[in-house]
């Protein structure tokens, strides 16, 4: 007999019991996609051992969803080979929005999707058992996949002695690490989304491939809900709204580096202004460090040896330089310009730094995935005893910031990775426990992500949920046990001795460009007044009303409002439509009556009409709406 732990309970099981055997004794086990054993995701066919700790996962769990989609990708490949036997499958990973599979020697269009989906449905209905095969040698694996040059290339690159596995379902077999569903049966609903060109391993010099994207779900209902969400997301696409609302553009000459227009800069300045006020009140001091620094700095930080392929480098007077991909090393140098005492701690240093990181062109996407962006970093230097309290302070700051934008969020605590190289076991345990206690005391829901911490310390990731329930990883709080030591940072402790400070590295927006993209989609371009690129548009009925309109606009601009005047020759109704299409918060129509009675005719972008309003009431209400950072209009 062996003993295993599941859901904090101990079970005695016969030797040789598999996770599937054990699962069969649990209610609703047919929903299980896989099992996490000792923090590693496994197939249900895995044999259990003495002392194993296990947790079964379903489609609603991130691990279970990945298994489900991975098997769905194999079903797609099997369907393609049934319909186009000469196609050559290459790789088919799970991605955020579903999965894709790349094929060589295949020519299809979206007109073929229905036929492919029907074949996928047939494969699912056949309920093939998904079986794992472990090859005895690299030679055996090469023989199995000898007709597929892409698989052969992957196998040859594997280190000698590494386990090589494949998964089969019916007549189809694919080189794969797994894990997978026990059978093709649970995959009930498919939808192929689009096809595109791709290159083997993302290299334009290599073979051209056809990439097919898809999604899959356990039920048709879930698929329909997802497709509705995709339709809504398309309406909110920040790339489309960004151009329509004249916020930003992208140019071929600078892929991944957006151009912000005047209207976009108004939103940008509002975001940054809010961030600065928030941090000043929280006791942060702001710095600015250079974008270009020499190789010697990046060697000390470890970036030159570990991150150089993602950095932009150049030579100046025969010396290597790099544009910074991260703000951290610059802050380390700032810290060293002064002597420090424990009495100054926590020392909170913030920077909105412009960083550059190389991304392949195929991965670029609007403001969400770029090569140049601004990151709102802060580095907090403190003693080990202050970690828990300061982490809690940061979590309170997180709550205040995201609630200001009406964004819900959840937190993930990532613990020590298996191959962590920095710090002792004891230090990792203390650091992780301090972060976990802070999370508990913040009363914010969180989950533990075992083994996903950085090599230099545990971290808390912040995942926000937008208006259509999509989640985005934005901010992070990381305990860094590496850089302070690497840069030989010191402070004088309470005993008068020199010590190395602990450092909390955190970003709240993360990439400000990405956060702005999220906000555009979250608000669907309909920004609250304090963030809006155009607060008020004054619309004249006739040319004779232009002087009064301009006088009002000038006065309101002095109060901090963004005001424009439309005195064009268009009809009043066309002017109103134009303003509403640009999501202007308030339109003020000015004609003879309004001038004679000294009143205003107000119209909101939701088409609410408020006639005969006094200027004082209008301005006082808008000032309250703007200054309170209200998410909803007060008129």
Swiss-Prot record:
MF annotations from Gene Ontology: ATP binding; metal ion binding; threonine-tRNA ligase activity; tRNA binding
Assigned keywords, A-Z: Aminoacyl-tRNA synthetase, ATP-binding, Cytoplasm, Ligase, Metal-binding, Nucleotide-binding, Protein biosynthesis, RNA-binding, tRNA-binding, Zinc
Catalysis: reaction(s): tRNA(Thr) + L-threonine + ATP = L-threonyl-tRNA(Thr) + AMP + diphosphate + H(+)
This protein's GO CC annotations: cytoplasm
Required co-factors: Zn(2+)
Domain of life according to the entry: Bacteria
Classification via InterPro entries: aa-tRNA-synt_IIb, aa-tRNA-synth_II, aa-tRNA-synth_II/BPL/LPL, Anticodon-bd, Anticodon-bd_dom_sf, Beta-grasp_dom_sf, Mopterin_synth/thiamin_S_b, TGS
Top EC category: ligase
Family according to the record: Belongs to the class-II aminoacyl-tRNA synthetase family.
Complex formation: Homodimer.
Protein name per its UniProtKB record: Threonine--tRNA ligase
Organism: Chlamydia abortus (strain DSM 27085 / S26/3)
């Amino acid at each position: 007999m062996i003993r295993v732990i599941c859901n904090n309970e101990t079970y005695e099981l016969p030797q040789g019991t598999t996770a599937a055997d054990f699962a069969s004794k649990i209610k609703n086990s047919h929903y299980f996609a896989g099992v996490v054993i000792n923090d590693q995701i496994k197939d249900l066919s895995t044999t259990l051992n003495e002392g194993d700790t296990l947790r079964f996962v379903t489609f609603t769990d991130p691990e279970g969803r990945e298994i489900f989609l991975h098997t769905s990708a194999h079903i797609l490949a099997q369907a393609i080979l049934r319909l186009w036997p000469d196609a050559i499958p290459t790789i088919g990973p799970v991605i955020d929005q579903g999965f894709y599979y790349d094929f060589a020697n295949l020519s299809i269009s979206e007109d073929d999707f229905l036929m492919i989906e029907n074949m996928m449905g047939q494969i699912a209905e056949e309920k093939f058992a998904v079986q794992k095969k472990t090859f005895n040698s690299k030679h055996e694996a090469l023989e199995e996949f000898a007709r597929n040059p892409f698989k052969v290339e992957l196998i040859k690159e594997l280190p000698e002695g590494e386990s090589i596995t494949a998964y089969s379902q019916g007549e189809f077999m694919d080189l794969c690490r797994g894990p997978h569903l026990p059978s093709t049966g649970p995959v009930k609903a498919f939808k192929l989304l689009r096809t595109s060109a791709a290159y083997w391993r993302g290299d334009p010099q290599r073979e051209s491939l056809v990439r097919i994207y898809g999604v899959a779900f356990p039920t048709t209902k879930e698929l329909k809900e997802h497709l509705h969400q995709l339709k809504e997301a398309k309406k909110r696409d920040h790339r489309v709204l960004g151009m329509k609302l004249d916020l930003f553009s992208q140019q071929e000459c600078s892929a991944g580096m957006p151009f912000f227009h005047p209207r976009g800069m108004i939103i940008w300045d509002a975001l940054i202004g809010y961030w600065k006020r928030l941090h000043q009140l929280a006791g942060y001091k702001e710095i600015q460090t250079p974008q270009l620094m020499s190789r010697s700095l990046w060697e000390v930080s470890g970036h030159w040896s570990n991150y150089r392929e993602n950095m932009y480098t150049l030579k100046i007077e025969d010396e290597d330089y790099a544009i910074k991909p991260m703000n951290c090393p610059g802050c380390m140098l700032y810290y060293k310009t002064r002597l420090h005492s424990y009495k100054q701690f926590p020392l909170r240093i913030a920077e909105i730094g412009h960083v550059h990181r190389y991304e392949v062109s195929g991965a670029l996407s609007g403001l969400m995935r770029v090569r140049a962006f601004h990151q709102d970093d802060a580095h907090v230097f403190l003693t080990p005893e202050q970690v828990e309290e300061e982490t809690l302070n940061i979590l309170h700051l997180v709550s205040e910031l995201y609630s200001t934008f009406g964004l819900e969020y959840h937190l993930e605590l990532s613990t020590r990775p298996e191959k962590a190289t920095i710090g002792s076991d004891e230090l990792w345990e203390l650091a992780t426990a301090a972060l976990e206690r802070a999370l508990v005391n913040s009363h914010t829901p969180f989950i533990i992500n075992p083994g996903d911490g950085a090599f230099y310390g545990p971290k808390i990731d912040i995942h926000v949920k937008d208006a259509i329930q999509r989640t985005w990883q934005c901010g992070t709080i990381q305990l860094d046990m590496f850089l302070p030591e690497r840069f030989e940072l010191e402070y004088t402790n309470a005993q008068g001795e020199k010590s190395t400070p602990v450092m909390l590295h955190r970003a709240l927006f993360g990439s400000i460009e990405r956060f702005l993209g999220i906000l555009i989609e979250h608000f669907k371009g309909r920004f609250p007044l304090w963030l809006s690129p155009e607060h008020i548009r004054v619309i004249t009925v006739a040319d004779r009303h232009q002087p009064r309109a301009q006088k009002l606009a000038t006065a309101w601009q002095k109060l901090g409002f963004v005001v424009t005047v439309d005195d064009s020759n268009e009809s009043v109704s066309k002017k109103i439509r134009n303003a509403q299409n640009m999501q202007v918060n308030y339109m003020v129509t000015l004609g003879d009556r309004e001038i004679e009675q000294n009143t205003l005719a107000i119209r909101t972008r939701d088409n609410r009409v408020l006639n005969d309003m006094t200027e004082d009431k209008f301005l006082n209400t808008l000032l309250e709406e703007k200054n309170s950072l209200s998410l909803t209009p007060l008129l």
